[in-house]
Amino acid sequence: MEQQDQSMKEGRLTLVLALATLIAAFGSSFQYGYNVAAVNSPALLMQQFYNETYYGRTGEFMEDFPLTLLWSVTVSMFPFGGFIGSLLVGPLVNKFGRKGALLFNNIFSIVPAILMGCSRVATSFELIIISRLLVGICAGVSSNVVPMYLGELAPKNLRGALGVVPQLFITVGILVAQIFGLRNLLANVDGWPILLGLTGVPAALQLLLLPFFPESPRYLLIQKKDEAAAKKALQTLRGWDSVDREVAEIRQEDEAEKAAGFISVLKLFRMRSLRWQLLSIIVLMGGQQLSGVNAIYYYADQIYLSAGVPEEHVQYVTAGTGAVNVVMTFCAVFVVELLGRRLLLLLGFSICLIACCVLTAALALQDTVSWMPYISIVCVISYVIGHALGPSPIPALLITEIFLQSSRPSAFMVGGSVHWLSNFTVGLIFPFIQEGLGPYSFIVFAVICLLTTIYIFLIVPETKAKTFIEINQIFTKMNKVSEVYPEKEELKELPPVTSEQ
């Protein structure tokens, strides 16, 4: 009875844990979502600014092709920066810690926020392009570090719920940018620099508030070897002094991983004991972006117009779609511990698969069947619901759960790189797919959804309510290795690396 009471106390959501989660997610994940959508509404106004700036310098306006190219570079700088940010994750979290990396990362938000806010006054579109690269780096770091930080703060029974919170704040950021981006608010000639500059507000708040909250106890004990600090952090997070059982669990992981040290990305790819974990995050992160989520949003306005929505009202319908995304991700926070990660992934990708197939038929028939555009709208909303339940929030959560402390930073670097490269690839090639396949474009995404669903069904285990060591034992059997920490033996066979730390 006493042990059960202790488990209940250790597993509760305390005020400190809740506030740490909200500040980390609002200060970092929110910015990611905000910057995804912030340039969509004022796109034409910003291109006009580019052209006027060029005219002021040269006395002539740009041709259509260089203007389109310049805008494409502006948009693509964000995912490119995200890729760079993903590569910085390992070095930052190992040097500064999880909390320290988030605080350092605010540089890549506050500086570009000031630059973008001043770009119109300075008559420099170059400031916007550079700033988009910097906020991309910020998003690349935060999209990996926030799930890692929250996953290491949370007790095992809350790890799923808190692990979905970053994705919830990404969707909230998208919705807020869509609302602020309404033409009668900030998507106008005077307002768009303010719209872009507001991204610095969450960063400034995080910079002020996050230092008062604990660092990851796992980082403190396993990597900094400071058990006293780790115990104090756990006591603050759990709201009571008796945290010996959790400290013992972290110490057990530390003892088992001492021989492993820091596992680099190169070692990660060479280790048989991490084979299925690595392949799983590549498939899930690739499937998340290549399943067509960005293409759906790209196509949504056209679908709404074809259904008879007046052009001046499309912006409100788009914001409504963003609200659906927020609501369904909010639901995922509460059901992830009830239904589990695996079921939400299977359900989410299956809904996306069906939505892509029906949408293909609806787009092909919309000129001959009068009510087909309404089916298209249903498909868009259904896809958004499906993606918000599983494919969007779960993959980053699983990276935290299926890797141990020594390999987790490198795993996030790999997963983040796949995420951003896939994001960039879809943005680059979808217009060509659309031009070549027309209404059948979404068949490509349906196939990816199908393949990802099959992989999840056959390979990905359930991780709900399991400790990191218990999850590692599941993959030990899958990888056909003889012990829970086989990297100790494998690392002996690798050539020595002198500058690995």
Swiss-Prot record:
Chain positions recorded as D-fructose binding sites: 32, 167, 288, 296-298, 387, 419-420
Topology Cytoplasmic: residue spans: 1-18, 92-98, 150-161, 214-277, 335-342, 395-412, 461-501
A single GO BP: response to fructose
Predominant place of localization: membrane
Transmembrane regions: 19-39, 69-91, 99-119, 127-149, 162-182, 193-213, 278-298, 314-334, 343-363, 372-394, 413-433, 440-460
Alphabetical keyword list: Acetylation, Cell membrane, Glycoprotein, Membrane, Sugar transport, Transmembrane, Transmembrane helix, Transport
GO annotations of cellular component type: apical plasma membrane; extracellular exosome; plasma membrane; sarcolemma; specific granule membrane
Induction: By forskolin in Caco-2 cells.
Residues carrying covalently attached carbohydrate according to the record: 51
Domain of life (superkingdom): Eukaryota
Pfam families with a match to the protein in the record: Sugar_tr (PF00083)
Expressing tissues: Detected in skeletal muscle, and in jejunum brush border membrane and basolateral membrane (at protein level). Expressed in small intestine, and at much lower levels in kidney, skeletal muscle, and adipose tissue.
Segments on the Extracellular face: 40-68, 120-126, 183-192, 299-313, 364-371, 434-439
GO molecular function, one term: D-glucose transmembrane transporter activity
Catalytic activity annotation: D-fructose(out) = D-fructose(in)
Keyword flag ATP-binding: no
UniProt membrane topology term: Multi-pass membrane protein
Protein localization: Apical cell membrane; Cell membrane; Cell membrane, Sarcolemma
Its job: Functions as a fructose transporter that has only low activity with other monosaccharides. Can mediate the uptake of 2-deoxyglucose, but with low efficiency. Essential for fructose uptake in the small intestine. Plays a role in the regulation of salt uptake and blood pressure in response to dietary fructose. Required for the development of high blood pressure in response to high dietary fructose intake.
Family from the record: Belongs to the major facilitator superfamily. Sugar transporter (TC 2.A.1.1) family. Glucose transporter subfamily.
Protein name in the entry: Solute carrier family 2, facilitated glucose transporter member 5
Organism: Homo sapiens
